[in-house]
């Protein structure tokens, strides 16, 4: 099931003089596993097949074969790696995305906290920078990560969420696409 809210932001300027700010599309769902990344990738493949310059900037590794198969059908921008303790992590390469400057870049997990905080503490800050370079971004978010809703959702679910995205960022989205699993 899908619902879509679209805003007209045709006059939105970026911080770069003369360049329009990129458009932000957020695929939002009530919990992990409802199909946000799958939906984002499915829509991206349709755009790619229509000759839109669309690339994957970062997709969270999934245990779902169907999602991974979709990701394999799209070009990818090389990611960076960092070490934290004994673990190695893959992360978004903001410089490379800006350098390659696709029309649209896919970036999974909007609420993510960056382990390597050399540039920005949070992924939504990375996305803001990319948008300000005129690149459209499609991203995913679980509703419990919205700052103004997280405490209410914690009361209902008993689950505390540390990673939060400020309301102003959500409100800046050009498209909010609600993704939900059918009760069947």
Please place each PLM-identified region on the residue numbering.
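Substrate-engagement module of ASCE P-loop NTPases
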Residues: 122-143, 165
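Loop/turn-to-beta-strand initiation segments
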Residues: 53, 101-104, 133-139
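Internal gly/pro-rich beta-alpha loop/helix module
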Residues: 139-184
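Short, small-residue-biased leader/transition segments that mark boundaries at the very start
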Residues: 1-6
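Conserved P-loop
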Residues: 21-95, 99
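Conserved ATPase-coupling elements of RecA-like P-loop NTPase cores
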Residues: 109-124, 148-151
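Conserved nucleotide-binding/hydrolysis micro-motifs of P-loop NTPases
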Residues: 46, 60-65, 111-112, 137, ...
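Pre-Walker A adenine-sensing motif
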Residues: 7-20
């Amino acid at each position: 099931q899908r619902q879509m809210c679209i805003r007209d932001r045709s006059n939105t300027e970026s911080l770069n003089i003369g360049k329009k700010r990129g458009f932000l599309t957020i695929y939002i769902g009530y919990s992990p596993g409802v199909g946000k990344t799958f939906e984002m990738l499915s829509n991206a493949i349709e755009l790619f097949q229509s000759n839109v310059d669309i690339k994957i900037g970062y997709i969270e590794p999934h245990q779902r074969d169907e999602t991974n198969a979709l990701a394999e059908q799209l070009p990818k921008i090389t990611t960076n790696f960092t070490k934290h303790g004994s673990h190695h992590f893959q992360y978004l390469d903001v410089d490379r995305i800006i350098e390659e400057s696709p029309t649209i870049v896919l970036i999974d997990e909007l609420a993510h906290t960056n382990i390597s905080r050399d540039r920005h503490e949070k992924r939504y800050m990375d996305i803001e920078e990319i948008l300000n370079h005129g690149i459209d971004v499609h991203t995913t978010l679980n509703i419990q990560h919205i700052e103004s809703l997280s405490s209410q959702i914690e009361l209902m679910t008993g689950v505390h969420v540390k990673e939060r995205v400020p309301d102003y960022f959500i409100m800046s989205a050009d498209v909010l696409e609600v993704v939900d699993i059918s009760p069947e």
